[in-house]
């Protein structure tokens, strides 16, 4: 079973940040949520919820 989450960034910046702490079980649902939730000037990306991505985006101080 794969799980997914969404990160976002301003089109003017390089770094993605955690968008929401919601976890999705379908990539399609995560992408749709990201598309409908983004403001103009932002882009989103759907990522696998794994230890590498978790450490990179969730454990940011």
Kindly give the residue locations of the regions a language model identified.
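Short aromatic-glycine-(Arg/Gly/Cys) micro-motifs in beta-strand/loop hairpins
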Residues: 1-20
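Short, well-ordered helical secondary-structure segments
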Residues: 3, 11-12, 29, 34-36
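Short, mixed-charge low-complexity intrinsically disordered segments
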Residues: 31, 35-61
């Amino acid at each position: 079973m794969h799980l997914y989450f969404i990160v976002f960034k301003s089109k003017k910046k390089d770094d993605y940040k955690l968008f929401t702490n919601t976890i999705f079980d379908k990539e399609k649902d995560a992408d749709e949520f990201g598309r409908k939730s983004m403001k103009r000037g932002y882009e989103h990306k759907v990522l696998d919820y794994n230890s590498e991505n978790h450490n990179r985006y969730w454990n940011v101080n």
